[in-house]
Regions:
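Conserved glycine-rich FAD pyrophosphate-binding loop
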Residues: 41-42, 46-47, 72, 79, ...
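N-terminal flexible segment immediately upstream of the FAD-binding catalytic core
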Residues: 1-65, 82-112, 147-155, 275-278, ...
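Short amphipathic alpha-helix segments
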Residues: 248-284, 375-391, 425-432
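FAD-binding subdomain of flavoenzyme oxidoreductases
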Residues: 104-107, 116-256
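A conserved active-site cap/scaffold subdomain adjacent to cofactor or substrate pockets
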Residues: 236, 242, 291-329
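General beta-strand structural signal in soluble alpha/beta enzymes
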Residues: 26-30, 53-54, 74-78, 96-98, ...
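Short amphipathic alpha-helices in soluble, non-transmembrane regions
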Residues: 13, 17, 67, 252-257, ...
Length: 489
């Protein structure tokens, strides 16, 4: 059952929170609350009663304890609203905005690790890491202003997945729904620094972290975590392969992934390629629309990093492999002379969905995991549903993120729409989501409609999740909209 705080209890919570963290950090202005009530997803809007912005672990702990006692629902938020519906609150609930907790607490250069708070953005982490000869792994769909910690916790697709894998967050500090502080892995032990590698930067956290991965704020608040950083190599080059056949795309992507050379890799259809490579100017929407028809069906983009002689060998190997299947390795994308420069810049400081949304006004994402070999049939099915609903294929973007498991990819299908086209998109989105599931898609981050689709088909899995939820959060205060089959969407 979803807990909904009564007006009296919410008012008492606001009073207690104001005393704990100061009036200026408890926001109740209607215009500000409205900003947090919706995003580009199809999740039903919900206006919070207030926004609280704690500045320390202790303040977060106090806020959670008050909410638990007064049965006031809390929705954690780290880096601004997203476009998947995960941070839309229960009506009259509370937004726990963690953006004031924006410090890089520690760094272990030798281990390639940094300890960060949830308010640290990718832009901030990248700038900090670069001073130490390191770099952060960045997300494909999210902007540089997103929270690094929550992105890694949510296992959102990263450009670097193809080489470095999905688990970038290691040990962490969690505040449970009753305010109890819990530390995973070696963070639970006393800290040991030089001459040894920082013990808290150890990548070994056991299986406990998996409880909070992709938990969508339903099982507590991650207030700090150690994340992996990667070296800045001597040579960094970007390369492209353009493809016009779905079946060839599978062969090309598989061969490149199998070689284990790319350090960052992504595949765009012509729509998302145009959105990605077009400069963000006042005429962005018009120029993007003009660019889409001129682009190849697919653009495979990746980086090669290392010493010069090593990169030269990798380039030669990939070019030879592609030549064997009738394709060329390109330095630029035809018709886009700045593609290399833009790709390298975006991998470091991504623009993400806020930029892409300027094409038509909004961008509704359908994210899933699937087998690389299923991409051709999934893409063909997608086109059929687009045509059935009278939606233009020039409005539907597809971005594929390869993983380090050759044959497994993350897909984002993006319905670029006008703000008022919610009802038009809803039926198309639902039918496509059902068909993708039938064809082998797995919704690892199920929000809104996707949660109902997944959990209703995996009752045993859902019951295990609910057992964990009832154990850790018996009062159901933490983001209660996320784990439900009955939410009015």
């Amino acid at each position: 059952m979803v807990v909904r705080g009564t007006i009296m209890l919410v008012d008492k919570f606001i009073d207690l929170a104001s005393k704990a963290i100061g009036d200026t950090n408890v926001i109740t202005y209607p215009k500000e609350l409205e900003k947090y009530s919706r995003d580009h997803s199809l999740v039903k809007p919900g206006i919070p009663s207030c926004i609280v912005r704690p500045g320390s672990v202790e303040e977060v702990q106090e806020i959670i304890e008050y909410a638990n006692k007064l049965l006031v629902p809390i929705t954690p938020l780290s880096g601004g609203t997203n476009n998947l519906g995960g941070t839309i609150p229960v009506p009259n609930g509370v937004i726990l905005d963690l953006k004031r907790m924006n410090r890089v607490l520690d760094i272990d250069v030798r281990a390639g690790m940094a300890s960060i708070q949830p308010g640290v953005t990718f832009e901030q982490l990248q700038e900090y890491a670069s001073k130490h000869g390191l770099r952060a792994l960045t997300p494909v769909e999210l902007p540089k202003t997103s929270s690094a910690l929550s992105t890694y916790l949510d296992l959102a697709p990263l450009y670097g997945w193809v080489y470095y894998g999905e688990e970038i967050l290691t040990t962490m500090t969690v505040l449970l729904p009753d305010g109890t502080l819990l530390k995973t892995g070696q963070q639970a032990f006393p800290q040991i620094k030089w001459p040894y590698v920082h013990s808290h930067a150890s990548p070994f956290a056991g299986l406990m972290n998996y409880i909070w991965y992709q938990s969508q704020g339903t099982l507590g608040v991650v207030a700090q975590g150690w994340v992996k950083l990667k070296p800045i190599h001597e040579v960094v080059e970007a390369f492209f392969v353009t493809v016009n056949d779905d079946n060839d795309l599978y062969k090309i992507a598989r061969e490149i992934m199998w070689m284990r050379y790319p350090r960052d890799m992504v595949i765009f259809n012509n729509v998302d390629a145009a959105l990605f490579f077009e400069d963000e100017t006042p005429n962005y929407g018009k120029k993007t629309a003009e660019l889409i028809p001129s682009l190849p069906k697919w653009v495979v983009a990746f980086t090669l990093r290392g010493r010069k002689e090593g990169v030269d060998i990798m380039v030669s190997d990939i070019a030879e492999k592609l030549q064997g299947i009738g394709y060329k390795l390109l330095d630029e994308v035809p018709g886009m002379p700045k593609a290399k420069e833009i790709f390298l810049s975006e991998v470091n400081y991504p623009s993400g969905w806020p930029k892409y949304s300027k094409y038509r006004g909004a961008r509704t994402i359908l994210p899933f995991i699937c087998s690389l070999k299923d991409v051709p049939i999934i893409h063909q099915a997608l086109k059929k549903f687009i045509e059935k609903h009278g939606f233009s294929t020039n409005y539907v973007g597809v971005t594929i993120t390869p993983t380090d498991r050759v044959g497994v990819v993350a897909c984002n299908v993006a319905f670029n729409r006008e703000i008022q086209e919610v009802d038009k998109i809803r039926n198309l989105y639902y039918e496509v989501a059902e068909e993708m599931l039938r064809l082998g898609a797995f919704y690892s981050r199920p929000y809104g409609i996707l949660a109902k689709l997944m959990y209703s088909r995996a009752q045993n899995y859902y019951e295990v999740l609910m057992k964990i939820k009832r154990t850790l959060d018996p009062n159901n205060i933490m983001n209660p909209r996320r784990l439900t089959l009955t939410e009015d969407l």
